[in-house]
Amino acid sequence: MCRGLSFICPFVPSTAQGRDFPLKGKIGIYIDIIELLLALNSIALKIPFVKYHGAGNDFIMIDDREGTIGPLLTTEWIARACHRHFGIGADGMILVQEGEDEAGFFMKYFNSDGWTSSFCGNGGRCFAAFTEDLEIHGGAFEFLGTDGWHFSQRDRNNEISLSMTDVHTIDKLDDKNFVLDTGSPHLVLFTDQLENIEVKLKGREIRNSTPFKEKGINVNFVEILAPGEIKIRTYERGVEDETLACGTGVVASAIAAAFSTDTNNHSWLVHARGGDLHVDFKHEGDQHFTNVRLTGPAVESFRGEIDLLPTS
C-alpha cells in the first residue's frame, strides 16, 4: 500500500512551460508566483485509506507512519470523511503513527465527530489487523493506545484477540446501573426489555444528564441471557448514536454482569447487533478484574483514496 500523500497538480504555470528557471524579468516571476499559488490552491491531496470493521463497528484506517498526514487533518474534515452520506462513512478514524522515543506504534483515534477520543476496543482490533496487512507484524503485536499498552494476537479462528486495561473500580449506582472504565468510560444498565428500548433517545438522555454531561459517557443497555452470556446495545458518545458494536462497552458489560451476579464465569459470550464478541478475564475478587481480553472479527471492507482538499 502507498504510504503518505500523493499529489495531483492540474497544471504547470504557463510561464514555466518550455523553458528553464529562473525566469527573465520581474513581471515573469510575479506571474509565475501567482499561477503557482493558484495551482497549489487547487491541488488534490490524495490520502490512501482502508475501511475495516469489527462486528459492524467500522473505521477508516490511515497509514501515517511518516507523520505527514496527521498534522493536516482538521476536525471538520475527519467528521465529513466519517459522514455516511457525504464521506466514506464510519464510526471513527484511526491513524497508524510511530510512537515517540522509539516506543513502537501509536493508535491515534478520532470519533466520527472529528475529535480525538479515549481508547476504542474494536478499533484496536482493527488497528492490529491493518498493521498486519501493512506487514508491520506477523500476527502478534504490541502497540500504544491512549490508555496504555495493548497486545494483540490472531487466534486459531482467524479472529483478533486484544488485551484490555484492567478494572479495579466499579461504581454501583443501584442494582441495575454500574459505571466503570475499560479504556473509555461506560454506564452499564441491565434490563429484561432490551429490544423495546429506544437506544438513541434514552442513551442521549443519560449521556447528557447532569453527572455525565461535561465529559460524556457511553451507555450500554444489557440483557443477561444465561450465565456467561449477554446481549448488548450501545449508545456511543462522539458518534452520538447507537452503534452496531462497541468493544470497550462489550468488555464493560461483561465485567459488570459478572460483578452484579457474583458468578464464577470468567468467559462471556456477548451478542452485539453487528455480531458476536468474546470477553475473558480473571476475577481477583471484589472489583478487581485482570488479564482482560476482547476477541472477535476484524475485517477489511474496502480500500481507496480520499481528497484532503477539494479540487474545485
Predicted regions and their residues:
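Extended Gly/Ser/Thr-rich low-complexity repeat segments
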Residues: 172-178, 303-308
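Acidic, Ala/Val/Gly-enriched low-complexity intrinsically disordered segments
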Residues: 12, 16, 20, 32-35, ...
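Residue-identity detector for glycine
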Residues: 4, 18, 25-28
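A glycine-rich beta-to-alpha transition motif near the start of alpha/beta enzyme domains, typified by
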Residues: 36-156, 188-312
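Active-site glycine-rich loop that binds ribose-phosphate moieties when present
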Residues: 162-177, 201-205
